Amino acid sequence: MGENEDEKQAQASQVFENFVQATTCKGTLQAFNILTCLLDLDPLDHRNFYSQLKSKVNTWKAKALWHKLDKRGSHKEYKRGKACSNTKCLIVGGGPCGLRTAIELAYLGAKVVVVEKRDTFSRNNVLHLWPFTIHDLRGLGAKKFYGKFCAGSIDHISIRQLQLILFKVALMLGVEVHVNVEFVRVLEPPEDQENQKVGWRAEFLPADHALSDFEFDVIIGADGHRNTLEGFRRKEFRGKLAIAITANFINRNSTAEAKVEEISGVAFIFNQKFFQDLKEETGIDLENIVYYKDSTHYFVMTAKKQSLLDKGVILNDYIDTEMLLCSENVNQDNLLSYAREAADFATNYQLPSLDFAINHNGQPDVAMFDFTSMYASENAALMRERQAHQLLVALVGDSLLEPFWPMGTGCARGFLAAFDTAWMVKSWDQGTPPLEVLAERESLYRLLPQTTPENINKNFEQYTLDPATRYPNLNLHCVRPHQVKHLYITKEMDRFPLERWGSVRRSVSLSRRESDIRPNKLLTWCQQQTKGYQHVRVTDLTTSWRSGLALCAIIHSFRPELINFDSLNEDDAVENNQLAFDVAKREFGILPVTTGKEMASTQEPDKLSMVMYLSKFYELFRGTPLRPMDSWRKNYGENADFGLGKTFIQNNYLNLTLPRKRTPRVDTQTEENDMNKRRRQGFNHLEELPSFSSRSLGSSQEYAKESGSQNKVKHMANQLLAKFEENTRNPSVVKQDCRRVSGIGKPVLCSASRPPGTSCCPKLEESTPRLPPPLKRQFSSTVATGQVLRELNQVPASGECPSRPWRARAKSDLQLGGVENLATLPRTCQGALALSGVLRRLQQVEEKVLQKRAQNLANREFHTKNIKEKAAHLASMFGHGDLPQDKLLSKRVPHAHPPSPPSCLPSPHPAAASSPPAADSVSPARKVVALNHRLPPPLHLTVGKVSSGIGAAAEVLVNLYLNDHRPKTQATSPDLESPRKAFPLSLGGRDTCYFCKKRVYMIERLSAEGHFFHQECFRCSVCSATLRLAAYAFDCDEGKFYCKPHFVHCKTSSKQRKRRAELNQQREEEGTWQEQEAPRRDVPTESSCAVAAISTPEGSPPDEPISPKKPKSVPEPNPRDVEAEATSPRPSEWTSVRISPGEDTVRQDVLAVRVLVTSEDSSSDTESDYGSITAPCAGAYEERPQLPESPPLSKPLTRHISLRENLTQPVSLLHEEPQALPALQRAHSLQSPTPSKYQNWRRRFQSNSTPMNQRAPSPPKEPPPPPSLSSSSSLPSSFSSASVPGHTADDSSSPQVTYNLHSPQISRGDVSPTPIYLRRARAQGIVKEIPLYLPHSPMLESTEDCLVEPGRESLRSPEEISSSEGCQEARALGNTRSIQHPILGKDQYLPNQNLALGAAGNPGDPREESRMGQPGGPELSKERKLGLKKLVLTEEQKNKLLDWSDCTQEHKTGEQLSQESAENIRGGSLKPTCSSTLSQAVKEKLLSQKKALGGMRTPAVKAPQEREVPPPKSPLKLIANAILRSLLHNSEAGKKTSPKPESKTLPRGQPHARSFSLRKLGSSKDGDQQSPGRHMAKKASAFFSLASPTSKVAQASDLSLPNSILRSRSLPSRPSKMFFSTTPHSKVEDVPTLLEKVSLQDATHSPKTGASHISSLGLKDKSFESFLQECKQRKDIGDFFNSPKEEGPPGNRVPSLEKLVQPVGSTSMGQVAHPSSTGQDARKLEGGEGGSSLVSSLVLVSDPVAPVTEATSSPTSSSAEEEADSQLSLRIKEKILRRRRKLEKQSAKQEELKRLHKAQAIQRQLEEVEERQRTLAIQGVKLEKVLRGEAADSGTQDEAQLLQEWFKLVLEKNKLMRYESELLIMAQELELEDHQSRLEQKLRQKMLKDEGQKDENDLKEEQEIFEEMMQVIEQRNKLVDSLEEQRVKERTQDQHFENFVLSRGCQLSRT
């Protein structure tokens, strides 16, 4: 008997083993049935089955399985299987989710029945598993059933294997599984319950199945179908047509197959090149592809329909997807070929054979299906009750929420839903009320679509059935029971149709501001906004808008700084409309619906177009109150940032703080208090003007100034008021826009233009700052003498009304320059200033409103002010400014000087000089130059106390008159008014699609580059890929649009050759012209300066800004110079490729890539979207040509550090330039949070460029601006030309690059490296010409170039050399286009350039000469000379610096290096000007400054040695090389420079001094200036630590750092954002010299540097000291990354990007070396002063490499045991390192998958948005036809109702476009993150190679990878900053809106 028992036991064990190892569904069932028969078990006894089975099968394998299952079943929620012992459940579908639900219910003790209509598990398709899913399945014993389950780093499994695992577990737990049974429907309980109490049953096929009598309480749909269970309404998420192909190939598990890497996913968003290569090679066009290796080689891809048609896979094209993919319409053979080709290409043809696996039908396992639409149930569960029987109905799996397959969420979310459903069943079984059960389930279901691996709990061990263990921050009551009443169904079952939903998320601001207004409300709103504007009478939505003034008025009413309404000419409808369209597009992202020309050409604009266009304004500004000063400060803080939004208005505060309340306040006491309050608060960045803070001067008051009595004042006020009232009725009067500053009461100059009889006569308006607000924007003029001068000093370019937008000046200023203007100027002035004209105009002012205002104003004003004082102001104002006076004014103030024509660029003084706003066309600027040649310098007249600034202001008045009252001025162009595109006349109308030439209706219309088209027609001309408004390229010459990867095809080679010839000719002419003009310069010839020097020509007035990048030899252009332009290529002919943000109002379309290739017939097509950044310096961006940009710069104010340094330096030149102080004070007060952000870009843009030996500047297109303060007066004429005679280049291989010198406003900091795709294009050999435009920045020269290190004789940054060094990066592409990266929109134009103007001076002035003798003057001059030479290095010199193996040679001093640079400039003749030009005293000062820096220069630097150098590399490469060179100190060269490589202890010595001096600089009295840098560093640190794509487990390896690596922390590496703000008193170092000094030094020369640098990394753990000894002994670079795991700081396993790429903080130089080797002080320093070093990132970039080459034991040890222990220790460390490397690899893969899934989600969302837009377009077209009378039933419907529907459609479209732009921003950030991660991994692999085996190519590759990675890091940084700014702005706007609503007594309900 015992033997039989043993036999039976052995048999059972074998059968159980067969059951566990079964590989099919049938085999599993068969083995299970045999097992139950053998062991006499009853499967229907679900309560005892598992326990009995466990007791009878006790093999060791089975026991391991029982242990796991018991551990799961021990959870308290199951109550030992008794929680739901009375519940019967039916689960429809035996898929993974159905079986997982069954298992949970079985654990709860329920009776569970699963019906599956098939008896085979044949799905080879692979599921991606989340970490918690893997953990959960392992807990169920998955590894016992399938040994390969998630082995290693595998995170996927085939559906078939997963089903088998769960199937077996379910059977063992007592679940009944019935196969070949199909569920049909639920049967209700019969009505006759008396005879038989039958509950809920189901109908099955076959009908006679035993389950037909099974009664159940719970039914769960898990079959993946959408309508298996009735009662669930569904939402449809439709994208564009998506056709998926799955293919399974036989996996023979060969070695070759094992080597093929899986493809976790290739997303089209950031892998476009892969798909384009695939298409070019095979003709297969995919959107994504995934390859998983399981039991088969599984491929899944999304194919494009056109590709399938072209390849013959689909025979015929049908609109209906079902017909399209039906078997009759698919060629199976072509489908197999298609899948095989795609798989071959994706695996790089490495799979030896691709034989298809066979599916359950015996056919090749290839399938094609449609997932265009995805569905989700609105509810997860419902309750039915019939005849007192309740039925709980639930959904899980795909039936509940269909996944988007590329995201890999299906299985994980299905399991979560299974757990939630089981929890619901448990709650219901325990007696919880049904409504509460449903409410809790719905609360959980709302979380399900949002779950990701990141936002669920990470402690998987604690996961139970309780949702609180899985979801953090869980709210089980977010849905209340009363909200789910409709889910408790007691009546007949309802059938719910499918409901189509858009998946577009709705932001709070959108939903709460939902509009339901009708067009008549829109009209009313427009009337309210335009009320009070002259010539604006809005009576309808059509004709009232034709002149364009109404549109401009709406914009002006909300953003007055954007448009100067006074300068608009009512007759110029084209310009007015185009201005409004351009400003709205640029600032608000509102796309134009037509062009200015079309608008003016039609008698009545299209009503629907206007409704659509105006609705966008309504949606944007609705609810925005007219903001008085108090509310503004209340909402935005006392120190309000008035630059909220994209235009950072630093000084144009006048336009933002105007009182707008229309109801005057009479409470004088309150107003006085408000005035005092505001006067106390003031503006932090402006001086108080107490003398006229409450004074207002009117011309008519001046007329009565003799009267001092208050009664007479009142009388005059009344008399004046009566005249005012009549004045406004005259339609010919241009609206007065002179206004005072609310809250400060500063008078401003009148900017309104008037007819000849008009004088600038302000109304009696303000006597206190808190005035009754005027009628909207009809403000009085306020004029003063000294106060006005002070105002001019404070507001740059305020030679005209500060309230007038800065960009509006170019038009008026330049119009004045014509010959006819000069002829009529005296008469104009007389007419404009005639007092009689004033009185006549005063009689035409509007009556009622102004009466109260004037009375109040007069009372307040004349109570407190002296009439004589006012009269003096008025007389002074109008008696000066080159304007002849007559009548009363001439009597009072004699005008002794003849009128002088104003300068083309009027500004009161260099500090306030602001260049005129530039248009994007260059041709108007040429006209300006020509006019300026004929204008003599303005005579600066003085009358009384008024300085020359008033003269410029008075000139503005004449300009305004000429502009506004001359019908059309030919001397100017509308392009100068605003950066807009004058579209070619050949364009089609707005109703014709640019591509298909068919009718395009309003709702479906998109516009770009002045073209209008259908959304579906907007495709790339090369690949026909769908384009988006936020990412495209456009060729103006060819009129074609391109996608990003194909924009390089924009120009043909013939055009390149033509332009090359033109540019060559131009360069020759320029060189000749410069040689001729050079002798005219009054500059010492011995100075060595390059093109970057700045100076003022003899004939140039001091108030004209001088471009810092103009050649010194360029004098003021004259007509002869202008003639030379005719022979040189016109700027409009230069091809400029622009990648710019499309409608990037709030950075929405940040990814816009528009490549404009300008031509002669489209001369103004740069249509800048970046304008109006900073009002005072907006002009600095208007006229600038497009620059090569990678990601534009996002932070507005960044160059103030140098200004602040100048202010604090006792030897600063600023003290000799009193006029510059106001601007400098403003700069000091408006400190940038990212002080030196742009210096990095100035380094970066030169990274991949050719030498500067092939450039020649074009003739300047306008007079040079005034020089910067730091410019030297002793600059040589011999180096004025940008062309270097001694250098030649191969023009055929590298075309010349010519720069346009006409724009003095361009900041060099704006130039950034080309995007990645640009470099790719360059790598492919695409050579095109790029006439790069010079960045001209007074800021750069006046402020930043002052940043010289006291111990250096050369500039610190290589970019400060010359104008020709400005844009090297884009030149590498070879096309005559400038590239602007799309990331940051218009903020790439630095909005702070005006600050530099404050430091401008006239070098020709004797004061400049005297300044040069002062301390600092010669030094600055010297530094300038050196800096201007230093990067004109020969190729040999540059290569020498970049040669990684060149560490053997001694380092030169900065002087010698500069001498060599000078030699290169001269073409080979060495002239040591550096040392010879400095006096002995200056040298001594420099020497003392060197000592003050204490060790900045190492001894090795001071050993001069001449040497030959190889060809050049870019400065960025130079920096990167130096960094890497410092890492490779164990190389041959490193050994030569390391006399004591065997040193076992960290040397001590000299760096003490350096550390101290650097820290002293950081902690000096100017240390507070570094706080913005620290802030930025922390911000970057936070970002990188959060968004790092790097490995999460490698941080410990960052601790074993070589001394030289850490020492290189002091490098001014390009990505270190805050580098230039580090030493406030330091001078800019020459980069080659700096690298020679800092990078190439050895640890023996800087004894303590290693420890201090390691400590400076900010490692928070003291354990780093324990492995310093090991660090110093390691020779191989690999050793430095081999720090064992236990040696790293505990828990420091996340090498975030903070360590990898964090920019050096604002005190990075101070952080370089700290005297303490303990690290505590250094950590404190790092924590307080910003992030860790960027250079240290290289440590983390490198993967820990293999074995440590040297034993770390003491070399003095001679014991064999010790050696053995050492070897053992090494082996252990190697093992640990291998383990760590494996973890890092897994982490990197997880990060990659995370990015992939995000990308797939974004891609899907974009498709859904596109589809939703298409649907809206269809509806809108139908509606539009009806409204236009084109439909048959047009006259039968109410127009008001139709317009209301139309309005709703328009609003919906606006939301969709906004959401689309947000998605594109996310996509761009994801692309950068992915690219960075790939580069990092690539660099890790490169650095694993032993140093001895590396050749030049290897080192070069490492260097290039490092450079590219640094560039990507910068781009991400800029993008994050941009997004942060946008978020801040949105939050502020929301808060402002909420405050407004709450102030109205309303309540906000967020939805």
Curated annotation (Swiss-Prot):
InterPro entries: bMERB_dom (IPR022735), CH_dom (IPR001715), CH_dom_sf (IPR036872), F-actin_Monoox_Mical (IPR050540), FAD-bd (IPR002938), FAD/NAD-bd_sf (IPR036188), Znf_LIM (IPR001781). GO terms for molecular function: actin binding; F-actin monooxygenase activity; FAD binding; metal ion binding; mitogen-activated protein kinase binding; NAD(P)H oxidase H2O2-forming activity; oxidoreductase activity; oxidoreductase activity, acting on paired donors, with incorporation or reduction of molecular oxygen, NAD(P)H as one donor, and incorporation of one atom of oxygen. Residues 991-1053 form the LIM zinc-binding domain. Residues 516-619 form the Calponin-homology (CH) domain. One of its GO terms (cellular component) is nucleus. Keywords: Actin-binding, Cytoplasm, FAD, Flavoprotein, LIM domain, Metal-binding, Monooxygenase, NADP, Nucleus, Oxidoreductase, Phosphoprotein, Zinc. It comes from the Eukaryota. Residues 896-909, 1257-1268 have a biased composition (Pro residues). This is [F-actin]-monooxygenase MICAL2. It comes from Mus musculus.
